[in-house]
UniProtKB/Swiss-Prot annotation:
Organism of this sequence: Shewanella denitrificans (strain OS217 / ATCC BAA-1090 / DSM 15013)
Family, per entry: Belongs to the peptidase S14 family.
Record has NADP as a keyword: no
PROSITE patterns: CLP_PROTEASE_HIS, CLP_PROTEASE_SER
Keyword Cytoplasm: yes
Name of this chain's protein: ATP-dependent Clp protease proteolytic subunit
Amino acid sequence: MHKAPESVLNALVPMVVEQTAKGERSYDIYSRLLKERVIFLVGQVEEHMANLIVAQLLFLESESPDKDIYLYINSPGGSVTAGMAIYDTMQFIKPNVSTVCIGQAASMGAFLLAGGAKGKRHCLPNSRVMIHQPLGGFQGQASDIAIHAQEILGIKNKLNQMLAEHTGQPLEVIERDTDRDNFMSATQAMDYGLVDSLLTSRS
């Protein structure tokens, strides 16, 4: 599939101009929203994206350790290790991280959505959430394949335990429901405990 050059994608990012005492200052829209403590997690969860998200979380903690951070998620999922780097940082930093699903939060995206601060995890009404077990593919000698299979099983068990803690569901329910792709509406995700509320309009 043809991929647009990065310069073209950058040109599509809107710029915001602010008036200050020293004159005009322009920001790309994401930098401007970062000033409001808003972070976007959009697209595939991979190492480069995870590093950027972690850096933004740490920066906002250093700016105001007692103010909430808002993480907007629209992601099909991706790398478990990259996702866990984001998740561990969310739990480690002092500010509460409020998560909001816009569009979709699937696989690792759903895990990060559920990992937000309790009472501060939200879905927009037409968003979709999907949970499942981690995917793995490996080629090589039989002994190496066995090692990787054990690693995937260990990750699966760990993620299921953490998801049970965040949702309040029994572990056996999580194990059953993540055995295959399990799609949920925003309301179903709230009933399941992945999020705490639906956001339909600004209060």
